[in-house]
Amino acid sequence: DAPGQPNTKALAQLKRLIRLAEETGLYLNLTGLGCYHKKEVPAWYHKLGETDRWKTQAHFWAAIAKVGADSPAIFCYDLMNEPILPGKKKATDWLAGEFGGKHFVQRIALDLTGRTRQQVAKAWVDKLVAAIRRQDQRHMITVGVIPWALTFPGAKPLFYAPEVGEKLDFVSVHFYPKTGEVDKALKALAVYDVGKPLVIEEMFPLKCGLPELARFVTQSAKTADGWTGFYWGRTLEEYQADKPSLKSALMLQWLDYFRTNAPARSQSPRKQ
């Protein structure tokens, strides 16, 4: 609602969600600080400078972690979806480019002000991790990142550099291989094999067909410890009942692949 003042109704909804996850045997990857719809971002938040913005983000995560601390349904806290930093020139907007009407990518700073990118990233990660750990010492923390090594050959991990990601529990990276470039994606994935468990946190046949994505998943098993993908709240059976359409066919194939190839779980996160 305001800096340092969490929205109590939203926290109550989170409690309901967590309880539902416990009852249905689901694990939650709680990804925070999303500003996907620019028009819904509070004006006061958008106007904050870096120091106050980080402070507010820390308050946010402390409130979330307090709610989730005792639940076995929490898989992890993901600090922010695809955070980025400015270049040499000062940026003017916290949100990066729009894609499909949404802003998935967000800056954690507008100006490096003489700092290295590693210094800024480490300070941000450490501040938010500390806020979570004051409330929850149990659950894992990660940051879902864009695999820049796929776009810029030779690029090294930023948030998972040794001096930056020390307090992150596992690597989360997002991959959408292009048609004919599965081997390139696998090579880029290897860059993020830094000695921590590695999860491909996002994937979907967005830029290639399902057979190529399936090959990427199979061959990435040499490096990755887990995979998660998109689920928009509709079951496989609901898509099967739809009138034929490209969207329904794509989602039907995807959910069928994921269900068929997902390993069986040995237990569910039910609260005792």
Language model: regions and residue ranges:
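Short, conserved loop/helix-junction motifs that constitute active-site signature segments
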Residues: 164-165, 190-194
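Active-site mouth of glycoside hydrolases
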Residues: 1-170, 179-180, 203, 207-211, ...
